[in-house]
């Protein structure tokens, strides 16, 4: 079973026991957290798509560690001015392990009109 979660302005496709790096979250290493903004949940062809989120779906995870990304250098130079500026930035991130995906109460994905027409023809 997999889910697509939204956190930190980004979307991640996760499954049980996945370890992912996301934007910084509060909480110490070992704390349990829950993601409730689930965009999609399912297994194979049997997937439920939210509008915008799947109702009642929850992904639980455990904080593994906090860290900082590699340094990104922002360098500005003004030619012929003997002027330059160097800045560095390291973004904070959190490493989490996905424990469980619960899809209870999700809305069913509405079938397309072509699929409905094919089902009617098969029934006749």
From Swiss-Prot:
What family does this chain come from, according to its entry? Belongs to the bacterial ribosomal protein bL21 family.
Identify the domain of life.
Bacteria
Assembly and oligomerization:
Part of the 50S ribosomal subunit. Contacts protein L20.
Task: List, in alphabetical order, the GO biological process terms annotated in this UniProt record.
Answer: translation
Q: Does the keyword Ribosomal protein apply?
A: yes
Taxonomic placement: Bacteria, Pseudomonadati, Pseudomonadota, Alphaproteobacteria, Hyphomicrobiales
Q: What is this protein called?
A: Large ribosomal subunit protein bL21
Q: What does this protein do?
A: This protein binds to 23S rRNA in the presence of protein L20.
Q: Which HAMAP family match?
A: Ribosomal_bL21
GO (cellular component) term, any one? ribonucleoprotein complex
According to the UniProt entry, its GO molecular function terms are: rRNA binding; structural constituent of ribosome
Protein keywords: Ribonucleoprotein, Ribosomal protein, RNA-binding, rRNA-binding
């Amino acid at each position: 079973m997999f889910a697509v979660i939204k956190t930190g302005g980004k979307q991640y496709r996760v499954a049980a026991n996945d370890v992912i790096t996301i934007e910084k979250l509060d909480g110490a290493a070992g704390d349990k957290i829950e993601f409730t903004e689930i965009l999609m949940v399912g297994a194979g062809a049997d997937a439920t798509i939210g509008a915008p989120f799947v109702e009642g779906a929850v992904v639980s995870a455990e904080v593994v560690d906090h860290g900082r990304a590699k340094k990104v250098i922002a360098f500005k130079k003004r030619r012929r001015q003997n002027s330059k500026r160097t800045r560095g930035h390291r973004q904070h991130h959190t490493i989490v392990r996905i424990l469980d995906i619960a899809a209870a109460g999700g809305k069913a994905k509405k079938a397309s009109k072509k699929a409905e027409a094919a089902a009617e023809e098969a029934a006749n």
